[in-house]
């Protein structure tokens, strides 16, 4: 950290300051900024006269717009009466079934670390660490061993990209944008991941949205909805990017490098258009269900500014179900 401070001071004449002084300066600066200041700033933010528009693309694309076309398009957009974005909150009952949950059957406290370990009747283990280091901030992670190592070679292309496709999936009856309107990502979010060795969830919340975070956790295990449109869009984007990348000399180098490094192992080959075309809806859906069908073999870690009497019933209800 100190080396970076000195480097920026030498290169950019940036002030060298301690974290305490930086905090003091930031607090003084922030308290002087008003809402009127921000509104005035953003009114002129997009009206600068020194704008630069840059378009890059591979040589095989011959119909890129020229300077006159770009100026015309820019002027058309600038002259439009663009209304502010309206947040439409879709009122929907996310979880329609009654959740019976699982009771806490064992509770162990580790005095040296302050960690509390809960074991639920369904087998899930939850490690809780209460901390006041960041006010009203709660972080959750859950993981289980397995990942794409559990996928057969015949479904590996779909398994490899299941995690990426799930990030675009509907959650219950909500699209991604509808979910974000209901649960603003500034305050709460949760998503799944699958890598080579494990599958899991990662998320965060404030206390106000804590129940919402656990609802999202339950739905990520039980009701992520992938359809053919998600698959088509994913493949279209990947294949388009592949066709651009292969024009670059780096592509040939990376391709040859991986072939030599991993000795032609089929799970480490550089993905091609043929590889992407093997991704299909059935395999993605089945692999997702296989990896997340049971929370009983997951470990969960929750760290943050929570109260035990508030979070434990949510753990029993949602992780327990």
Task: Label every model-predicted segment.
Residues 1-32, 50-57, 127-129, 134-223, ...:
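M16 family metallopeptidases and their MPP-like homologs
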Residues 4, 8-145, 149-152, 299-301, ...:
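Proteolytic maturation boundary segments
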Residues 219-226, 318-321:
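A common structural junction motif
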Residues 46-47, 291-293:
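Edge/loop elements at the starts and ends of beta-strands within beta-rich repeat scaffolds
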């Amino acid at each position: 950290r100190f080396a970076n401070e000195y480097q920026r001071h030498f290169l950019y004449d940036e002030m060298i300051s301690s974290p305490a002084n930086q905090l003091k300066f930031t607090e003084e600066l922030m308290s002087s900024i008003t809402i009127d200041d921000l509104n005035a700033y953003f009114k002129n933010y997009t009206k600068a006269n020194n704008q630069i528009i840059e378009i890059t693309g591979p040589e095989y694309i011959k119909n890129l717009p020229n300077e006159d076309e770009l100026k015309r398009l820019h002027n058309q957009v600038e002259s439009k009466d663009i209304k502010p974005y309206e947040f439409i909150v879709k009122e929907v009952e996310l979880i329609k079934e009654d959740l019976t949950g699982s009771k806490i059957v064992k509770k162990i406290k580790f005095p040296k670390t302050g960690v509390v370990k809960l074991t639920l009747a369904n087998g899930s283990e939850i490690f809780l660490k209460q901390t006041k280091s960041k006010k009203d901030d709660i972080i959750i992670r859950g993981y289980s061993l397995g990942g794409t190592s559990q996928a057969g070679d015949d479904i590996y292309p779909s398994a490899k990209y299941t995690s990426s496709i799930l990030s675009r999936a509907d959650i219950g009856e909500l699209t991604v944008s509808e979910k974000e309107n209901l649960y603003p990502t500034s305050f709460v979010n949760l998503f799944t991941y699958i890598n080579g060795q494990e599958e899991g969830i990662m998320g965060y919340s404030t206390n106000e949205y804590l129940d919402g975070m656990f609802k999202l956790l339950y739905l990520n295990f039980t009701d992520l909805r992938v359809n053919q449109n998600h698959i088509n869009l994913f493949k279209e984007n990947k294949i388009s990017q592949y066709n651009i990348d292969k024009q670059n000399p780096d592509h040939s180098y990376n391709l040859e490098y991986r072939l030599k490094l991993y000795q032609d192992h089929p799970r480490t080959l550089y993905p091609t258009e043929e590889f992407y075309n093997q991704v299909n809806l059935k395999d993605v859906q089945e692999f997702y269900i296989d990896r997340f069908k049971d929370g009983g073999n997951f470990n969960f870690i929750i760290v943050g500014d929570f109260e035990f009497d508030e979070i434990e019933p949510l753990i029993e209800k949602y992780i327990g179900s």
